[in-house]
Amino acid sequence: KLGEMRGKSYPEPMKLMGVENQRIEPIVGTDEVLLDVQNLTTRFPVKGGLLRRTISNVHAVEDVSFKVYKGQTLSLVGESGCGKSSAGRSILRLVEPMAGKVMFEGKDILGLNASEMHKARLDMQMIFQDPFASLNPQMQLMDQVAEPIRNYGLASGSELQDRVANLFDRVQLPRSFMRRYPHEMSGGQRQRIAIARALALNPKLIVADEAVSALDVSVQAQVLNLMMELQADLGLSFLFISHDMAVVERVSHQ
């Protein structure tokens, strides 16, 4: 509920009914800059006419600047269609910005070539709004969590299986779920799988794009608490994109 964090300086997990020995402590973070976005601009061309020429542009992100600190959460808040998701995708270069700088640990990632950007994505991952759409319905969950590790050649064989099993532990899912398929899971469980995939490469920054907006309130609280626990344990930074002010108030440092 909006206003519950009044008087508190840092994010704090929610107290859940029926959960014993729950860790409730503020998440402080550091004052060291991880991500420095400067004057980011992204526009999408609108084409028309017989030759399909560009006749105008949609100004999705216009001259946006902010900083994300190590171990902290910065939230981008706005109504649907305001460009906040485009900003998140632009930072990871899932869409290409037209102008600006995205300084990650002091290096402008907009100047990286394709192979350099592929390597940089080890440190930057994204969680999408719809976990069902972001998961392959024909793949077992263990293979989907293993996929980024395998693609980067970070582990194979029994070592890979152990890493995947540990990721299921991290997101508080039973290892017996590893051979299930997405349709066999609830919305909250699918989002935990999406979080496990994001964690697979040990990133420093996670862009969470409306990561809990498709979940009901009780499941939202569980997933948000999980994200805050992971932040406290792993020192993660989050760029949290949302339209829900009550959620933003709970998880944000800025």
Question: Where are the model-predicted features located?
Answer:
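Conserved ABC transporter NBD signature motif
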Residues: 100-108
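Hydrophobic anchor residue at the start of the ABC signature
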Residues: 145, 195, 207, 223
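A short, proline-enriched helix->beta-strand linker immediately N-terminal to the Walker B motif
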Residues: 200-204, 220
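ABC ATPase NBD coupling module
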Residues: 51-55, 109-125, 151
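Conserved ABC ATPase "signature" region
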Residues: 108, 159-176
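Conserved ABC ATPase signature
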Residues: 181-185, 189
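Conserved signature/switch motifs of ABC ATPase nucleotide-binding domains
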Residues: 183, 201, 234
